[in-house]
Amino acid sequence: MVSIHICAEWCHLFLNGAVYDVPKAICFGDDKAAARILATEDVAEIKALGRLVSGYDESLWNGVRQIVVYEGLLAKFSQNSGLSEQLKGTGQAFLAECAVKDRIWGIGLSMHDPNRLDRAKWQGQNLLGYALMMVRERL
């Protein structure tokens, strides 16, 4: 396994989601997949390539992915004072990613679902919300 370090130069990858899938490919030694992901800006293609990473081990990735996203978000918000101020402006609010189809990074509920306000009724893990709150605390 290759060690992963998200450097500040990778912030542009957030524009297309590759900040998640490139380290995933690198983590499992799939340099070809990493290169193919970097060669495209098509979000759907990036996601598809990320699903095809050779040697992928879900148990291992589940332990690494939160660190990858946290480091990427920290770099992104540290380099952009406007974004940083917006995030800090949320104060102590509990942040949630309202995404019906995403039960890992989101809460599995839409922005219009009244259950979004009740954490006991969330259908997802909200890993993105937790990562954003960690970054906010660090800033």
Language model: regions and residue ranges:
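Charged, low-complexity intrinsically disordered segments
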Residues: M1-L139
